[in-house]
Amino acid sequence: MPDFIKVTYNQTGKSKKTNELGMREMQERAFAAKTAQYLLIKAPPASGKSRALMFIALDKLKNQGIKKVIVAVPEKSIGASFDATNLKQYGFFADWAPAPKYNLCTPGSEKSKVSAFLSFLESDESILICTH
């Protein structure tokens, strides 16, 4: 059967190259706006949006005086992409290391999400992942 529609992209590999902090081009552009109160990142699937959020959230926690980060995702399966991630090995100043107890998107996580959320707010932990 012939292809009726064929789409090709100019694949240069540029989007997969990383800088000295381990960021792809799109992540670097997002990180440049890290001090913004609101930030919308629009990019294709699997382009590194979750990791871009990790970079920005860690900067807000370490350098901007923010005490807690709540990552609210539209569905539980997306929450899995926010598991612990070694970012230091690629040059970033910190690793993404949320406490498993406060990733409310993983199987077997806290039965009462409200209780877990309230516990997080009163704890010293700085990262919570949940659905919105």
Can you describe what each PLM-predicted range is?
Residues 51-54, 61, 65-89, 131-132:
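Conserved Walker A/P-loop ATP-binding site and its immediately adjacent core
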Residues 2-42:
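Conserved pre-motif I regulatory segment
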Residues 38-40, 68-70, 125-127:
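Residue-level preference for the first positions of well-ordered beta-strands
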Residues 113-117:
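Conserved helicase ATPase core of P-loop NTP-dependent helicases/translocases
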Residues 121-132:
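Conserved two-lobed SF2 helicase motor
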Residues 77-110:
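Conserved helix-turn-beta segment of the N-terminal RecA-like "Helicase ATP-binding" lobe
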Residues 62-64, 119-123:
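Conserved catalytic network of the ASCE P-loop NTPase/AAA+ motor domain
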Residues 36-56:
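Walker A/P-loop
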